[in-house]
């Protein structure tokens, strides 16, 4: 179970994911592509999941992991992803 799920599509998303894991918070960083996953190095507190998720897949992920916090650090133009994250959290 991850305390935080970060949707990382920006440099800031990668930095947030690293910061949280360095402070011993279990983080799942979701990135859209394999290329994006190369920007993060997994460790005992950081797991990286590559692949685009639709709203239902996000709901399933949130139900399964029961995170305390979900962060949207996707690209500002990724409005559809932001809406899916918001809907998935409801």
Question: Residues of each region from the PLM?
Answer:
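Hydrophobic/small residue at the entry helix of a nucleotide-binding pocket
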Residues: 12
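A short, Lys/Arg-enriched amphipathic alpha-helix followed by its capping loop at the start of a domain
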Residues: 16-27
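Short, polar loop motifs at secondary-structure junctions
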Residues: 31-37
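Active-site-proximal loop->helix
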Residues: 38-43
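Glycine-rich, highly charged phosphate/nucleotide-binding loops
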Residues: 44-63
């Amino acid at each position: 179970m991850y305390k935080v799920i970060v949707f990382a599509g920006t440099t800031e998303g990668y930095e947030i994911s690293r910061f949280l894991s360095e402070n011993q918070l279990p983080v799942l960083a979701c990135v859209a592509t394999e290329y994006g996953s190369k920007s993060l190095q997994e460790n005992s507190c950081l797991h990286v999941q590559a692949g685009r998720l639709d709203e239902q897949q996000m709901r399933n992920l949130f139900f399964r992991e029961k995170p305390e916090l979900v962060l949207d650090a996707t690209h500002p133009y990724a409005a559809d992803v932001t809406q899916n994250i918001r809907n998935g959290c409801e």
